[in-house]
Structure formats: C-alpha cells, structure tokens
Amino acid sequence: MSISLNTCILILKEHHLLKSSAVQDTVATKMDYVSYDSRDIQTNTLFFCKGAGFRPTYLSMAKSNGANCYVAEQPYPEGKGMHALIVRDVSKAMALLSAAFFRFPQDDLYVVAFTGTKGKTTSAYFLKGMLDQANGGRTALISSVNDVVGPKPEDSFKSSLTTPESLDLFRDMRTAVDNGMTHLVMEVSSQAYKKNRVFGLTYDLGFFLNISPDHIGPNEHPNFADYLHCKLQLMVNSRKCIINAETANFNEVYAAATTTTNPDSIYLFAREDFENPDLDVPIDFRFASQELDMKETRFKLFCATDKAKKLPINGDYTLKMLGDFNESNGTAAIIGAGLAGLNHDQCAKGIRNVTIPGRMQTERTKEHGMVVVDYAHNKASMMALMRFMQNEFNDPKIIVVVGAPGDKGVSRRPGFSESLSAYADKAFLTTDDPGFEDPKSIAEEIDAGIDHSKCDVTIELDRKKAIHDAIASAGPDDVVLICGKGADAFQKIRGVDTPYPSDIVVAQQVINELEGQDEHFRK
C-alpha cells in the first residue's frame, strides 16, 4: 500500500486542515508506510508528530530511519529536507490519511459500534457471537479485552486501548478485510471521540447503552458535559441508532441521533415495566426477566411497534452470563443482530454460550461462598453487580476487593465509596493500575468517603494478598466480589505494564489452597 503526497494534500485541503506544505521535489512522491512511532519506521514512511509527549528528537529519529514526510501542527527544524504537511489538527489528519492509506477498509465491512458507561464489552461480545453464528465466524472485534482481525488464533490479541489510535484502527480493519471478515463490532470510548481516533468514520449501527459520570478528571474529561458530548458523537455518526430508553440524559441522546438520522432508523428499547411520562416517542422493544439463577439468565424480548415487528427476533433468550443487568446488554445486541439480517433462532443460538474473560466469572466454593471475578470498574457497574448479588442471594454478606486506577478516572473514587457504603459489608481496598500515583493515597481517598458503620474496610495494597484475605474471610453463604481487573494480566505501574497473574488465576489459586480443590472458574 502507498499514498502520494498529492493525495495527502488534497484530502487535507478538502477537510480544511492544511495550513501549509513544504514539497522537496514532486507531489507525486509516494509514502509506502505510515507511523506515529519513531521506532517503527520503514523507507518512505509518512510520520505523524502527535501526542502531548511528542519531542522533536522523535522526528530526527524517524528521519534517520527512513521517513520522507511528516505531518505536524508546526514545522520542525529537525524535519529539514523532508516533505512537510503542517495541519490545524494532527489527530484529525492522521485519521483521514490513515483511512486513505489503508484504502478505506470501512467500505468493505458492516461496521457496528457500542458506547456507554457500562456494558460496551458485554454487548459487543454478544453481537459478535450472534453474527459469527450467521456468517461463519467472519466477525472482527475491537474491544477493551481482545481485538480479533481474522479467523485464526494468531488473529486475536490483547487490546491496549478500548478504541485504538486511528492509524492502528484502520490498519486492523484492512487486515480484517484481507482476512475475509465481513462484519466489525467495536467499542467506541468517549476518549476515542475526544482524541479523534474515529474521526471521519460512519457506522452502519450505533448503540447508546447508558451514561453516568465517569472518566472525569485532569487527564480525561474536564466535566460531565464534555463526557456526554463525546459520547453523543456516535449517534451523530451512525446510519441507524439503537438507544436504551432508560438511559440518563435520554432527551439529549435522542436529539443527537435525530440530527443526522431519520426517526424511522432510530430504535428504542427498555425493560417491560419501564415508564417515562415525559417520553413522547414509542419504545420499539421491551424485555422482561423470565428466570434468574446462578447458572443462566433467561429473558423474553417483545417487538412492540410496527417498525420493530419487521425484525423476526421476538421470543425467549438464554444467556450463560449472569446478572439481570446483562438482559439490557443482550437486548441491545439482539436488536443489532436483527438489523443485520438475523432471525430469532440464529440470535438465540449465537448468544446463548457467549462468555467474556473476566466478566461475571463465578466459582461456588464449599466453605467460602460464591466468588465472582468481574470487570466492574465504576460506580454504575459496581452498584448493578452488588444489587444483583444482594437480591439473588437473599441479602448475603458481601465482601468486595477493589481499587481505583491512578492518573485518570478520579471521579470513580467517590463513586466506589458510595457503592461500597450502600451494599458492601466488608471492603479490601487494593492496587489497580496506580500509574504514577501512590496506590496507598488512592485507597485512602476511597476509604475517606466510606460509611464505616455500614462497611468495614481493610487497606491491603498487595492485590494477591487482598484477594486471599477476602476469600479466606468469607463463610459458606457469603459473596466475594473481585472487581476492576477481570482477566488483565498486568498492573500499570509508573508507565510499565508489570506482569500480574490476573484476578481469575489468583482467585483460583486461593480457592485451591484453602479448599484443596482443583477446579476452574465457570466460563
């Protein structure tokens, strides 16, 4: 693949991004590789000078390694002798030029995206499971857990960002197309829009699951309004929109969808008993719990409007994943599958056995109750998880292991305090990706907001020991919730992904040690 300098100039001019250009010989010059990492350069590379931590020495390194053109928001002396494209916004430029370099792979895929404070990953996996059932496993995935760009085991790998940098995203999409994939299901984070990682991308289907305050802090969103604004961009950039009618800020979400989408292509869903007298648009799909237990989740989906009844998806569904909150995620995914052409039988078969590493993985022990590993990592997901456990186990003693990440998501900390005070009997506050912050200070900040008359607190920064002590302290009828990291096999500490066995592995080791059993978490 290659892209000419002239094509780059035309694209940047078309989007009013080009401020100036320095052409060394001819605009017919071609670039055969693209990169924003000075360590990843080939001969004739188009290099993007991006990021808050960018240093001119990176451009010098890229030049010496073979880059022949750079894109930046200002000219650099270090780029003397190179072609230069000076732009108003390098992140937008990188998205547009990467799409062109990789020959617009989105045009060869049916692209579906989920946004929401919680439920993105689960919904994405549910939909992938159903689409795979219909298309023979040709569904690509971009998620916070794994990325899948082909049918072979080596085509699946651990993701580093919920939504990759635009260059990586379009490269992965091209790989998926070349590997025969026909559909792409992806999570789109608020940061993806704030940092223009998906700039210029239009989705066939866009889902808005829910919203509550999260990712608000110095290095993320300055306030909730900014967070909401970024989330809403998915609605503006989708051909068809699926919205949870129960979401907070529904009016803003629906209004954003209608700016670019005809109401006939906007679908609403909600629980059967949900009522909102202020809602002046019909709810197309309803769902209702059939049975909840610690083995399966069963619910029924109703097509309530004429528009909804055109999709043959009405009926009963079973999920292997536990939690009544997953019924909403499942409903969203089923609607998406219906819009992609699937019927009830295909959906029911495809969704039934979907599991996600680190999401609602459970182990019933003999002497230490029910142990649950889940990725719940904000107030909304913690509240939903503990509420479900309280109801399902008839008000058990709830023991929670949790920590908050450093350098971001500062708003999560009071949310953890509030949720633990509301539902937990005992909390072990521990380390969870502290970054450059002191994990003890983070734990103490959470502890300061907890009502200690309701929740007993232990600060144990060694996460493995915290998990051990939590399980060891539990009785046969108790519930132990290990929250936040799921299947992550690392801790982000001072800029380094430090190896960590994962909560699932640690919890199983503890259970085996305490009870002498050699079993594995329910998948």
Swiss-Prot record:
Pathway given in the UniProt record: Cell wall biogenesis; peptidoglycan biosynthesis
Top-rank taxon: Bacteria
Cystine residue pairs: none
Entry's transmembrane regions: none
Cited function: Catalyzes the addition of an amino acid to the nucleotide precursor UDP-N-acetylmuramoyl-L-alanyl-D-glutamate (UMAG) in the biosynthesis of bacterial cell-wall peptidoglycan.
Family per record: Belongs to the MurCDEF family. MurE subfamily.
Protein name: UDP-N-acetylmuramyl-tripeptide synthetase
Annotated source species: Lactobacillus acidophilus (strain ATCC 700396 / NCK56 / N2 / NCFM)
Gene behind the chain: murE
